[in-house]
Curated annotation (Swiss-Prot):
This is G2/mitotic-specific cyclin-B3. Coiled coil: none annotated. It comes from Drosophila melanogaster (Fruit fly). Keywords: Cell cycle, Cell division, Cyclin, Mitosis, Nucleus, Phosphoprotein, Ubl conjugation. Ubiquitinated. Ubiquitination leads to its degradation in early anaphase. The keyword Nucleus applies. InterPro entries: Cyclin, Cyclin-like_dom, Cyclin-like_sf, Cyclin_A/B-like, Cyclin_C-dom, Cyclin_N. The gene is CycB3. Belongs to the cyclin family. Cyclin AB subfamily. It is found in: Nucleus.
Length: 575
């Protein structure tokens, strides 16, 4: 049927009605957006963007902070790490332009509120709140109310008087140990420094203000004031004020009460046993070269304190006595200990550890066995734990627990090694500053300018003595002196037997005469002459290498040859 004028007019009218129904929601949304722009922007700028008619509109009204449907939201790989993650976006500057509310009160805003309060005119529109009762407007009202609370607390703090610091009366006499020093002619009074109170002048409130820190404004129930270090300095720890200046006042009052008590004079007392333990440093003899003075400018030699350090280590030797513990160890034998030390030397070579680590580990084992009884199944575990502790003490990069479990061939697990480590530290009372013979030997050889092959031979003698149970009770400093004396005699050759080996230089720096450690020399020499077993050749093979100058192949001397021309064996009752 062909269209007529009537049917055409009816179709046009129906199309107009449908178009009107589709346009009306769009015009309504456009009007709402225009009114919203007036309340937020026009109130501040006084004009309207002429292109507001071209704004992108939505067919359905959404929440204020909901994103546009067709836009893509970018998020950081780590996400938002704040408390208000749901209302944070990636463009905070644009959010502030659009919202204009929820900002922290600045110094100018606080000053404006203070002036308005003084003039009883609180109608200052600081934050530009809208008339509509929305979440944003309620947020503005809460912010204004919080600012008023801050001002009230500041005024309360300004009204308090500032306490005057008390001066501590100077002591007339100072006692150091048992020596009484004369009093100073004009003793200087030292005032007690109390934490400063918040007695600030009114014009300075804008410059020194409490900072209001808001973590989540929607869930905020009470204020939190964090005083900076420049505003409130505490002598012990930082003071945190949670919206209450009364806490600061109470702390200041308590500190003031403590200082008002009768002060006691300063007494510096030393332990009664300290004077007997201090070893005086004798003057350097004329025939002895002052090694420390010669190396005074070398910071690595520590020449200023070297003599004091080694005298202190000699005093500490008495704090680590090792008695004959094998009768108490009913499950162990001296041969088991020898096998353990030989295995520890192999571990030191495998991991390329320092020699000090090996000596400290053996000391820890002996100290533990002096105080605790164990069975033979735990002996290797004790050696591994002692080595693990020594590595942590001396090594830059200690091996891992898995390395020690591997070197033990899977005999123990991770928990057993850690448990033994804790137990060992508890038994030795966590004291790892044990004087070691290796450190004494290095000091003595350096002062006497001993050549490296001779020093290596002395180290071989010392390391071989670690396996001998008969040497556990000897002094480490005397062990180092005996090993150095033997190395000097053995490397001197047959033509140097009548030469005086223990010179005045060694006597001065070691502090020992030859007769003081002659008994140790015979014990060490007996260990060198003992026929080695096939199962304990680690140390001999180690020092037979060219790196160690093959000192294990040096010919041995008898006791008589060792002391020839230096000490009379008949007078010393030595054979």
């Amino acid at each position: 049927m062909a269209p007529t004028k009537a049917t055409t007019r009816a179709a046009i009218t129906s199309g107009h009605h449908q178009l009107q129904q589709a346009v009306n929601p769009i015009l309504g949304a456009l009007g709402a957006a225009t009114r919203k722009g007036l309340t937020r922007r026009a109130a501040a700028t006084g004009n309207i963007d002429p292109n507001v008619e071209n704004m992108q509109t939505r067919a359905k009204r959404k929440a204020d902070h909901s994103p546009i449907k067709n836009d893509k939201i970018k998020r950081s790989a780590l996400g938002n790490l704040t408390n208000n993650v749901k209302i944070m976006t990636l463009h905070p500057a644009q959010d502030e332009e659009q919202s204009g509310v929820g900002k922290k009160p600045t110094a100018q805003q606080l000053q404006a509120l203070m002036d308005a309060k003084k003039q009883e005119n609180l109608s200052v529109n600081v934050f530009g709140a809208s008339k509509m009762t929305t979440r944003a407007s309620s947020k503005v009202e809460d912010s204004v109310e919080n600012c008023h609370k801050v001002l009230d607390k500041l005024e309360e703090a300004l009204a308090r008087p500032k306490p005057r610091p008390k001066a501590v009366p100077a002591a007339k006499k100072t006692v150091l140990g048992e020596v009484q020093l004369p009093a100073m002619p004009n003793p200087m009074q030292i005032p007690v420094l109390l934490p400063p109170t918040h007695n600030l002048a009114a014009p300075q409130v804008a410059a020194v203000k409490p900072v209001r820190r808001i973590s989540n404004d929607f869930n905020k129930t009470e204020d939190s004031l964090y005083m900076s270090a420049l505003e409130d300095v505490s002598s012990c720890d930082s003071m945190r004020l949670s919206g209450n200046f009364e806490a600061a006042r109470r702390r200041s009052a308590k500190l003031q009460q403590k200082t008002e008590q009768q002060p006691q004079p300063l007494l510096l007392t030393l332990p009664e046993t300290a004077p007997s333990q201090v070893v005086p440093i004798p003057p350097v003899p004329e025939e002895v070269e002052d090694f420390d003075r010669k190396n005074w400018d070398d910071p690595f030699q520590v020449s200023h304190y070297a003599m004091d350090i080694f005298n202190y280590l000699k005093v500490r030797e008495a704090e680590f006595p090792i008695a004959d513990y094998m009768p108490r160890q009913i499950h162990l034998t001296t041969w088991m200990r020898t096998l353990l030390v030989d295995w520890m030397v192999e571990v030191q070579e495998t991991f390329e550890l320092n020699h000090e680590t090996l000596y400290l580990a053996v000391k820890i084992v002996d100290l533990y066995l002096c105080r605790e009884v164990i069975n033979k199944e735990k002996l290797q575990l004790l050696g591994a734990a002692a080595f693990f502790i020594a590595c942590k003490y001396d090594e830059r990069q200690p091996p891992l627990i898995e390395d020690f479990l591997y070197i033990c061939d899977g005999a123990y697990n991770h928990d057993e090694l850690v448990r033994m480590e804790r137990e060992t530290l508890r038994v030795i009372k966590y004291d790892l500053g044990i004087p070691l013979s290796y450190r004494f030997l290095r000091r003595y050889a350096r002062c006497a300018k001993v050549p490296m092959p001779t020093l290596t031979l002395a180290r071989y003698i010392l390391e071989l003595s670690l396996m001998d149970y008969a040497n556990i009770s000897f002094s480490d400093s005397q062990m180092a002196s005996a090993a150095l004396f033997m190395a000097l005699r053995m490397h001197g050759g047959p033509g140097q037997l009548d030469k005086q080996t223990w010179t005045s230089t060694l006597i001065y720096y070691t502090g020992y005469q030859l007769a003081d450690f002659a008994e140790i020399v015979t014990a060490l020499n007996a260990g060198l002459h003992r026929k080695p077993r096939a199962t304990i050749k680690t140390i001999r093979n180690k020092y037979s290498h060219k790196i160690f100058h093959e000192v294990a192949k040096v010919p041995l001397l008898t006791n008589q040859e060792l002391f020839q021309g230096n000490l009379d064996l008949n007078e010393s009752n030595l054979s």
